[in-house]
């Protein structure tokens, strides 16, 4: 059995981040910054440029921004973030920027000859959705991460079939 330690550590950090996020704890965002760096390195090794660009160029900066907004907007008990209700303007911005992000990154990934380009592009879209909703302090962020997890399972199944590595 061939286990990649970096992938194992990244998975543990990522899962821990999601647990803290579910509790509305700002440590979720700090762990997401660390996870983004680890995941960027793993993605680079597999030439999954979309994943690398997404996590280092979008998820990590959004996690930094979310750390700031979460610290500035604590709930009344002071232990978690105050949830913000999504408004129509948030949904419009989400759809507009999500569409632009998807189109732009599809072409970037095509130029970089990214393997599994369709799933890589969908992963960028779902990552954007999750990061944007997290930054907005919306409880719907988990929906974005759940969609992204489904896409990532498919994407990394392709990678493991190609490289015959066992990740977990």
Q: How should each PLM-predicted stretch be described?
A:
Residues 1-24, 72-74, 80-168:
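Polytopic alpha-helical membrane-helix bundles and their juxtamembrane interface segments
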Residues 30-34, 50-54, 143-147:
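Hydrophobic alpha-helical membrane segments of integral membrane proteins
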Residues 35-38, 57-58, 148-151:
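Transmembrane alpha-helical core residues of multi-pass small-molecule transporters
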